[in-house]
Amino acid sequence: MAATSSTSSQSFDIELDIIGQQPPLLSIYTQISLVYPVSDPSQYPTIVSTLEEGLKRLSQTFPWVAGQVKTEGISEGNTGTSKIIPYEETPRLVVKDLRDDSSAPTIEGLRKAGFPLEMFDENVVAPRKTLAIGPGNGPNDPKPVLLLQLNFIKGGLILTVNGQHGAMDMTGQDAIIRLLSKACRNESFTEEEISAMNLDRKTVVPLLENYKVGPELDHQIAKPAPAGDAPPAPAKATWAFFSFTPKALSELKDAATKTLDASSKFVSTDDALSAFIWQSTSRVRLARLDASTPTEFCRAVDMRGPMGVSSTYPGLLQNMTYHDSTVAEIANEPLGATASRLRSELNSDRLRRRTQALATYMHGLPDKSSVSLTADANPSSSIMLSSWAKVGCWEYDFGFGLGKPESVRRPRFEPFESLMYFMPKKPDGEFTASISLRDEDMERLKADEEWTKYAKYIG
């Protein structure tokens, strides 16, 4: 295994987006893996040098991508201010040759199994774990903005890119990966790309004047736990990929469109699939939960459009919508009614106002530890979903001479009950959902007749 980098000679001090200042986000890395077939092993050295040169070009124009996230001014009752400051000359690249490792995946094995989650172990294919677990995660350890790992496997390679989540959301990470692919091809960056990458993060969300906290933040401020109550131990959970063909998605969208609420004129494929997942998980959870158990659907929303910011802005600019009901109501209502609930919260003006309210509240708060986008989600009955369907990773070739990726996956990390992701949508329209559920819910879901009509288990 080799890692390449050198100490930075640059000088910069970039305060993170106010929404990126949430303490939980500052300890997380978001990972994404792109898989390419390699027919000629003699290409590997050239691939490494191409990526190294691309990282140099990217860092010359945007030195902060090689920086680190550092929190300054921490004291009693103050979580400090997190910034990107210099770290190295280029983002660190780890090169790992797994071709002689019998436990490592091969391109043929991945293909035959449908690129399952279990074959993308973050401890093998990623340069750093998602969660701050294990060595290197102390308060004084560096948190690089960007980390990469190039894994050589028999017949192919897996390129994993880790982004520090306080510094970027997945849309921002995708913008950086796209520019890295351009840099590897020795293509120039446009003025628009340069301008978006260098936007002042402190002013992206204008603060509200004379703001008083209202119900718009109810789901985002953690309530103090009752004295003496220990939090329940997390349930034993597992991760799995499920895929949905374009035909299955079209049928789900048709079913939702036929049963829409009177208040809705339209739902997207993403709305219909999200609703189907909420309904299906609620249905299987009725086996262990009371019908009147509250359920909440927390759905990440890219705020670049509503805030009038470039779609390629690289920071963290997302919020969530929240939908409350009971397990039985969601399990039993028409699909279109559930999809309409999800669509109803996507009003741009309302989203913008809610995001400004959150930013304004956080700006005036010395101790931000009570703020979380999933502050009141109960993993036993709720869902927390991020859709990466629009992320462009299927298009990037990095000038490797290998064509476009054969698969794009998020590596497997510790199970986290009710956390879910939609992978970047395949060019043919197929969606893959990465779903974490407690074991008994997962087993019931895999056997559920309505679910298996549309979803294929990959593992």
From Swiss-Prot:
Associated pathway: Sesquiterpene biosynthesis; trichothecene biosynthesis
Keyword Cell wall biogenesis/degradation: no
Superkingdom of the source species: Eukaryota
Residues noted as binding CoA in the record, renumbered to the chain: K253, F266, V267, S268, T269, D302, Q318, R343, S386, K390
Metal-binding keyword on record: yes
Catalytic activity, EC: 2.3.1.-
One of the record's GO molecular function terms: transferase activity
InterPro entries linked to this entry: CAT-like_dom_sf, Sec_Metabolite_Acyltrans, Tri101-like_N
This protein's UniProt keywords: Calcium, Metal-binding, Transferase
UniProt-annotated binding residues for Ca(2+): D218, I221, D376, E449
Family: Belongs to the trichothecene 3-O-acetyltransferase family.
Task performed by this protein: 3-O-acetyltransferase involved in the biosynthesis of trichothecenes, a very large family of chemically related bicyclic sesquiterpene compounds acting as mycotoxins, including T2-toxin. The biosynthesis of trichothecenes begins with the cyclization of farnesyl diphosphate to trichodiene and is catalyzed by the trichodiene synthase TRI5. Trichodiene undergoes a series of oxygenations catalyzed by the cytochrome P450 monooxygenase TRI4.
Additional remarks: Trichothecenes are sesquiterpenoid toxins that act by inhibiting protein biosynthesis.
Matches recorded under PANTHER family: FAMILY REGULATORY PROTEIN, PUTATIVE (AFU_ORTHOLOGUE AFUA_3G14730)-RELATED (PTHR31896), TRICHOTHECENE 3-O-ACETYLTRANSFERASE (PTHR31896:SF64)
Protein name listed in UniProt: Trichothecene 3-O-acetyltransferase TRI101
